[in-house]
């Protein structure tokens, strides 16, 4: 089975306009928008648009009622059907008093479970691995801003490739388009790059081969020795 997915790189600061534009220009199975794309002030109008367009969306959401806590929402034809709260925060986010989520878990979608790593969480293999225990059809990495420099871009995409390889699953990522280096990427379940866009805005469409994500040719999960990993939780 193949899933047609759009990875959105919208201009930051005008989410309703960007939402209308991207939804009207493309017809796919699943739309993915970056971290903080919607917030408490734009959510109601966005839900109406998504309902009218009859679309299925995974988007970043900034909960202004909870000090800007970052979440991911799964929206089916204008209805929020699941959500996940960012669990691993940057030093800057903690200094601002943001609260982390209490459970690392996949979100449920009509296509199957999907693990959504919110921005900085890509740096922690434990997050993707915990999500992979739920046998997701793919991983998604929604990013707030773009990359600040070429080195960060190289590091970030290398980490994404590693997450794909070690979990034998597709991973898709996207950021906003602003002054930094915006990007959209896709790595397949063996770590081969199927999409890499930098310094471009808009919606980028790929076909995710779910059979490849399900194959688990090596199946690293079966070779884990969890009792030896206890030190990670100390």
Where are these regions (language model features)?
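Active-site-proximal beta-strand elements of phosphoester/diester hydrolases
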Residues: 1-12, 32, 112-121, 140
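Active-site metal-binding loops of divalent metal-dependent hydrolases
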Residues: 10, 36-37, 121-122, 144-145, ...
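Active-site donor-binding loop signature of nucleotide-sugar glycosyltransferases
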Residues: 10, 85-86, 109, 199, ...
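Cys-nucleophile CN-hydrolase/nitrilase-fold catalytic domain and related Cys-dependent amidase chemistry
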Residues: 13-83, 146-165
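CN hydrolase (nitrilase-like) catalytic-core segments centered on the catalytic cysteine
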Residues: 43-59, 125-203
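Active-site catalytic loop in hydrolytic enzyme cores
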Residues: 67-134, 147-158, 212-230
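Long hydrophobic alpha-helical segments typical of transmembrane helices together
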Residues: 186-234
